Curated annotation (Swiss-Prot):
It catalyses: L-selenocysteine + AH2 = hydrogenselenide + L-alanine + A + H(+). The modification N-acetylmethionine is found at M1. One of its GO terms (molecular function) is selenocysteine lyase activity. Catalyzes the decomposition of L-selenocysteine to L-alanine and elemental selenium. The active site is at C388. The lineage of its organism: Eukaryota, Metazoa, Chordata, Craniata, Vertebrata. This is Selenocysteine lyase. One of its GO terms (biological process) is amino acid metabolic process. Keywords: Acetylation, Cytoplasm, Lyase, Phosphoprotein, Pyridoxal phosphate, Transferase.
């Protein structure tokens, strides 16, 4: 039986993929972790910050004595670190349990705000009085994370909202700006487009979308229509490339700690919270987080999230350069060992930016489905796609099919995502491991 130690940057050479356990003939067999888009290990500095908070800041942050004040100070400092990481203001950050809650909170708030406005108009009358049975309209892409897609589908089923799922272009791999603008209706209230796709690494044109929506909003306001808000789920992009809310021009941005070597909590950025951008709580209780997200704060986790954000602010350019170098080397080695005709790089679109760490590829062959190949690997720890879709068997990823990847090719897909301390030597081990796995499967046939 084999066991793998969680990767960490200060472990022996290289920390990110240090194995343990027993392999054939009871000898240790090295494991290489390449599933950093699924989750990342905690940085040692993050663990230290969390541990210190557990020892020293155990008090209730709402309490006036020293342990409580210490907890409150840690929370405020973490809020500032998150704001600095994304170029926002601390008062525009709300802590949540993670990305799923943040995304649901945005959708919930837009629905509540729509109906609050409808009620207000009904009381005041006027030219733009509400239409009976009117529903808010959402625009999103066909490749969003389930924490966006499923809540929206649920609202449609409940006849609470209308949703347009804009297909991604098979030429660029992106949700095209013109297609998004073409979907706008008078009742449109939110455009939500992920910043980078978790399976392919494709970066979406969020700044251009925001610019076009902002221009459109001027026309809408002049016509007496409410403005359209823009949300992006930045879970996969943070820690891999620079993310700045001013450059993006968004009203909401989702932050997920465990994607950038932090703990499994999250946060939500809301531009001009309560003043320019509405937010409605899903929970009601003690009034924490200015009543927007009540519940006694999880100080140690928030401390860790703040430290992880601080490390990203300090080192993001170096992280990005290293991951890009290793990812590019991985793709070179795959094509060199298997041949360019046999390797299909599923997320390379001319002129389209990708995350620096993500390689989604297929090895062509009739019996080389992704999950079958991974089962034969002795070294590689990776996935065929999103971790939340790991129970789909040999069915190809709907995301890859949306990108125009042929069915048989998509069924063979593997998603390898490298981390901050993944090395070229580990890439060599992984490529050789894939070669032996493929050879074994072909021999069995």
């Amino acid at each position: 039986m084999e066991a793998a130690v969680a990767p960490g940057r200060d472990a022996p050479a290289p920390a990110a993929s240090q194995p343990s356990g027993c392999g054939k003939h009871n000898s240790p067999e090295r494991k290489v972790y390449m599933d950093y888009n699924a989750t990342t290990p905690l940085e040692p500095e993050v663990i230290q910050a969390m541990t210190k908070a557990m020892w020293e800041a155990w008090g209730n942050p709402s309490s006036p004595y020293s342990a409580g004040r210490k907890a409150k100070d840690i929370i405020n400092a973490a809020r500032e670190s998150l704001a600095k990481m994304i170029g926002g203001k601390p008062q525009d950050i709300i802590f949540t349990s993670g990305g799923t809650e943040s995304n649901n909170l945005v959708i919930h708030s837009v629905v509540k705000h729509f109906h609050a406005n409808q009620t207000s108009k009904g009381h005041t009358g006027g030219h733009h009085s509400p239409v009976k049975g009117a529903k808010p309209h959402f625009i999103t892409s066909s490749v969003e994370h389930d924490s966006i897609r499923l809540p929206l589908e649920h609202l449609v089923e409940e006849q609470v909202a209308a949703v347009t799922f804009v297909p991604v272009s098979k030429v660029s791999g992106q949700a095209e700006v013109d297609d998004i603008l073409a979907a706008v209706r008078p009742t449109t209230r939110l455009v939500t487009i992920m910043l980078a796709n978790n399976e392919t690494g494709i970066v979406m044109p969020v700044p251009e979308i925001s610019q076009r929506i902002k221009a459109l909003n001027q026309e809408r306001v002049a016509a007496g229509l409410p403005p359209i808000l823009v949300h992006t789920d930045a879970a996969q992009a943070l820690g891999k490339q620079r993310v700045d809310v001013e450059d993006l021009g968004v009203d909401f941005l989702t932050i997920v700690g465990h994607k950038f070597y932090g703990p499994r909590i999250g946060a939500l950025y809301i531009r001009g919270l309560g003043e320019f951008t509405p937010l409605y709580p899903m929970l009601f209780g003690g009034g924490q987080e200015r009543n927007f997200r009540p519940g006694t704060e999880n100080t140690p986790m928030i401390a860790g999230l703040g430290k992880a954000a601080e490390l990203v602010t300090q080192n993001c350019e170096a992280y990005e350069a290293h991951m890009r170098d290793v990812r590019d080397y991985l793709e070179e080695r795959l094509e060199a060992e298997f041949g360019q005709k046999r390797i299909h790089l599923n997320s390379q679109f001319p002129g389209t930016q990708r995350l620096p760490n993500t390689c989604n590829f297929s090895i062509r062959g009739p019996r080389l489905q992704g999950h079958v190949v991974l089962a034969q690997c002795r070294v590689l720890m990776a996935s065929v796609g999103a971790a939340c879709h790991s129970d789909h068997g040999d069915q190809p990823s709907p995301v890859l099919l949306s990108y125009g990847v042929p069915f048989d090719v998509a069924r063979n897909a593997l998603r390898l995502s490298v981390g901050r301390s993944t090395t070229r030597a580990e890439v060599d081990l992984v490529v050789q491991d894939l070669k032996q796995a493929v050879a074994q499967l072909e021999d069995q046939a």
